[in-house]
Curated annotation (Swiss-Prot):
Organism for this UniProt entry: Saccharomyces cerevisiae (strain ATCC 204508 / S288c)
EC number: 2.3.1.-
UniProt protein name: Probable thioesterase YBR096W
Enzyme class per UniProt: transferase
GO cellular component, one term: endoplasmic reticulum
Other notes: Present with 1950 molecules/cell in log phase SD medium.
Length: 230
């Protein structure tokens, strides 16, 4: 085997290891969850297992999604760790899956798909993620108010024991130009009750009075005992 052949194989392996950075890869990864949660049920039935599971759980609105991946070479910067800018692509995928699942019933039964634009994002970078290092991204709703839904995402390594980054995202539910109140959306999905309302109220107070989009330590230690994976 010649040197050129070896080089070609090594280069091919390098490209394969960076599949997340290939043209179009982002759209494939993002729309995989959109198709899975919103388009396939059109053929398999609107009463999905996800909807049934959430409705049976009194804390269903606080369920989380988890994405397992790794830092590919093209995602790393000149400091030889995952570039800060690449965190947001993973956030799109993780949060997109979460919102499609939590509000799946609303979206499937609406005449027009409501959409959920991002209003604000804050990310606190705590520890580096090295090239080829495996990590997980988990996202869950932590609270809401009359208009906004607040989602917390955690980047962790070593099976969730080490927090590398924490992100807060502010969402709004829209039906055309009309804003859908989070409470109304959760009630429609069968996920609203007094217990989750109290948790949301406490977390919102923590977010606005002790944290905001600048200090995240109290949120890093936020209880997850009532959260389950979906």
């Amino acid at each position: 085997m010649g040197v050129c052949t070896i080089f070609r194989w090594l280069f091919a392996a390098y490209l394969l290891s960076s599949y997340k950075s290939l043209p179009g890869a982002y759209f494939v990864r993002f729309y995989y969850y959109v198709i899975q949660n919103l388009f396939l049920p059109m053929f398999t039935g609107f009463e999905t297992e996800n909807i049934k599971k959430l409705e049976k759980n009194e804390y269903g609105c606080f369920s989380y999604t988890s994405l397992d991946t790794y830092a590919s070479p093209f995602e790393c910067d000149f400091y030889f760790h995952k570039s800060n800018s690449t965190y947001f692509a993973e956030l799109d995928i993780s949060r997109g899956n979460l919102m499609c699942k939590i509000f799946q019933k609303l979206m499937l039964n609406s005449k027009h798909y409501p959409y959920i634009p991002v209003a604000n994002v804050f990310t606190n970078f705590l520890k580096e993620i090295k090239p080829f290092q495996k990590y997980s991204v988990s996202s869950r709703i932590i609270c809401w108010d009359e208009k906004w839904i607040y989602v917390m995402s955690r980047f962790t390594i070593k099976k969730g024991t080490v927090l590398c980054s924490l992100s807060l995202t502010k969402y709004v539910l829209k039906d055309g130009r009309k804003t859908i109140k989070p409470k109304d959306a959760l009630e429609y999905c069968g996920l609203y009750n007094e217990k989750v309302a109290k948790i949301s109220e406490d977390n919102l107070k923590l977010l606005t009075e002790r944290c905001g989009f600048h200090e995240t330590v109290p949120l890093e230690n936020l209880s997850q005992e009532y959260c389950s994976e979906i």
